[in-house]
UniProtKB/Swiss-Prot annotation:
The lineage of its organism: Bacteria, Pseudomonadati, Spirochaetota, Spirochaetia, Spirochaetales. Residues 588-614 are annotated as: Disordered. It is a multi-pass membrane protein. Keywords: Cell membrane, Membrane, Transmembrane, Transmembrane helix. Residues 591-605 have a biased composition (Basic and acidic residues). Its main location: membrane. Signal peptide: none annotated. It is found in: Cell membrane. GO terms for cellular component: plasma membrane. This is Uncharacterized protein TP_0577. The chain crosses the membrane at residues 494-516, 552-574.
Length: 614
């Protein structure tokens, strides 16, 4: 049947289409485009049933033309309605395929799954970490119970929060080439053994022919081994030349148990040992006693040239070991996460403040400090300001600004004088404040003032919150009493001498008592031996023992009596000394406004006038 002819098939007229025109019509028909209804399934169904493009027209229907295809494309009829049209083929295979395609087309597309955030994605790569046992050097026995749980504390700190390690390109390259390098070095060792065996052939007591045969055999093996070495070298270069991501995120797994440290052999190669144990890094520690303080050093080792061993050191008292381990673990976590050094810039007010960073004083606050992310303790203090101590967290970023603003203490100008208006030096600790009467500026700080010279002193302190608001005030301190000071010194000396005499008398009484007990036991044994039948001859010295026992009894009684008397004497003098100390304790004084002082002065003068008149 030629193109353009009609035929009678299935009781209707069918207009055949040339294959070339069929391909054009498949492209032009909108059902075959991938943009129809936004589904690839519809396009596949339309392409699957491309014979349906040769639509069976009725006898009166005109032949399809390009204009009809263009109008059909403008209408965009759905593919499901086309498949369900009566003009579709009636073959059973096409009917089954038509039903399946209709089901595919009727199924709505699945909603797009939201992409998870990178922070919530669990990395596929694993970076395994182990903690070995710590070593102790020079730790006294009294402090060993403090340092024993150091490794357990570090293990707990590392297990608290999840860790992510970023594998750099250099680290990935070295880890990929590590097994090939091990094979390369193994081949080198095997070649060295073969060369050594070849050299020792000349020492064997064999014939020259056998020696040449053995040497040739070893030479052949050495050449084969050199070929293997060259292949291993090529494999190492190939592994290092591979493409790696600039940064690959890996999840850190802390292996082992709290009470089970990672066991290390006596001699080992770190990179090979870690690869055999399927580990990525190893943490070791060392604790050293330094003049009563403990110095803790942690080492993070990977065995790779791209990742050198990093050391973290901190020192402090033994009782602060948990705090030290907490700080070191924070620094270790930052190193595990491949944190870059942080440049810390200080912005401290007042400028003359003293700042210590993790217990280490910072000499120049105008210069930046280089540190690593983690938790640190900062202490700031300045004269005339409230001190501040705070734990800060430095994030993983290039620069960190530490801004500190100390709160100034309230300053008050007061006039200092004594109750009897006499002149006496005033000391605050070892610092001389002035000689009364004088004016000075004091802060709302509870400090003890010493009034008077060394021979006659009194003590006082200012109660907090007692300064008049924005008013000039006068601080009246108690005048020194020479008699009270001398009496206090005398009672102190007497109490010290009483205690010294008691310390001498008590050991003497104890020694005499023990000697008396030994003498009584010896005398009893001698009497028991003399009372046994038949009576043996009386041992010599029994009378001497009795006289010695009597003398010791008298001496012990006297010593015990003296010790009791001295004990009572010490108790009495200690009580008198404590009573004098209580009377000479620092007195609380309150600053008074100048108008109150003037009123009191006028009142005292009026009372004196009344007394004179009377």
């Amino acid at each position: 049947m030629r193109n353009g002819e009609y035929s009678r098939s299935h009781g209707r007229s069918v207009r055949t289409v040339h294959p070339f025109l069929l391909g054009v019509s498949v492209y032009q028909y909108p059902v075959c485009r991938t943009t129809v209804n936004g589904s690839y399934a519809q396009s596949f169904a339309a392409l699957l049933f491309f014979p349906q493009i040769a639509v069976a027209f009725s006898a009166t229907a005109p032949a399809p033309s390009f204009d009809s295809f263009l109008s059909a494309r403008q209408r965009h009829p759905p593919a499901s309605s086309f498949l369900a049209s009566p003009a579709a083929p009636t073959h059973p295979l096409f009917a089954t395929a038509r039903t399946t395609a209709a089901q595919l087309l009727s199924t709505p597309p699945a909603p797009a799954r939201p992409r998870p955030r990178p922070d919530h994605v669990i990395p596929k790569e694993k970076w395994r970490l182990a903690v070995a046992d710590f070593t102790f050097h020079g730790i006294p026995k009294i402090f060993q119970r403090y340092v024993r749980p150091a490794r357990e504390l570090l293990f707990i700190e590392l297990k608290k929060l999840p860790l992510r390690h970023f594998l750099s390109e250099a680290e990935q390259r070295e880890r990929a080439a590590l097994p090939h390098e091990e094979a390369y070095h193994a081949r080198l060792k095997e070649r060295a053994h073969l060369q050594r065996a070849r050299d020792f052939v000349s020492l064997h007591p064999v014939s020259d022919h056998a020696r040449r045969l053995r040497t040739a055999a070893f030479e052949k093996q050495i050449k084969e081994k050199e070929q293997e070495i060259e292949r291993a070298r090529v494999e190492v270069r190939t592994a290092r030349a591979r493409f790696f991501r600039p940064w690959l995120q890996a999840e850190v797994l802390v292996l082992g148990a709290q009470n089970e440290p990672h066991a290390l052999p006596e001699r080992f190669h770190l990179a090979t040992h870690l690869r055999q144990k399927k580990l990525s890094a190893l943490v070791t520690g060392k604790l050293v006693d330094v003049a009563g303080y403990v110095r803790i050093s942690l080492y993070l080792s990977t065995g790779l040239e791209a990742e050198p061993t990093r050391e973290f050191t901190l020192a402090g008292p033994y009782r602060e070991l948990p705090r030290l381990m907490h700080t070191l673990s924070a620094q270790l976590r930052s190193a595990i996460e491949n944190a870059q050094p942080v440049r810390i810039v200080f912005d401290v007010h007042p400028p003359h403040a003293r700042l210590s960073f993790q217990g280490v004083p910072v000499e120049d606050l105008s210069k930046p400090l280089i540190s690593y992310p983690g938790r640190y303790v900062v202490d700031v203090s300045a004269a005339g300001y409230f001190s501040a101590t705070k734990e800060i967290y430095i994030e993983n970023r290039p620069a960190f600004s530490l801004r500190v603003r100390l709160v100034a203490r309230p300053q008050h100008r007061v006039r200092v004088q004594l109750t009897d208006n006499s002149a006496a030096p005033i000391f605050s600790g070892a610092r001389s404040v002035g000689v009364t009467p004088f004016s000075t500026v004091v802060t709302d700080l509870r400090e003890i003032f010493t009034v008077g010279p060394a021979g006659a002193r009194s003590f006082a302190f200012i109660e907090r919150g007692t300064f008049p608001n924005s008013q000039p005030s006068t601080l009246v301190l108690p005048a020194p009493n020479p008699n009270a000071t001398q009496d206090l010194a005398y009672k102190r000396d007497v109490a010290y001498w009483s205690f010294g005499a008691l310390c001498i008398a008590v050991p003497i009484a104890l020694i005499l008592g023990s000697t008396l007990a030994d003498t009584h036991q010896a005398l009893e044994r001698a009497k028991a031996a003399s009372a046994q039948p038949p009576p043996p001859p009386a041992p010599a010295g029994t009378g001497a023992l009795e006289r010695k026992s009597q003398h010791l009894l008298i001496g012990t009684g006297v010593a015990v009596g003296v010790a009791v008397i001295l004990s009572i004497n010490f108790i009495v003098h200690a009580a008198r000394y404590l009573n004098a100390v209580m009377h000479n304790a620092p007195q609380a004084v309150r600053p008074r406004a100048d108008k109150d002082i003037q009123t009191l002065t006028h009142r005292d003068e009026a009372e004196e006038d009344q007394e004179e008149d009377s």
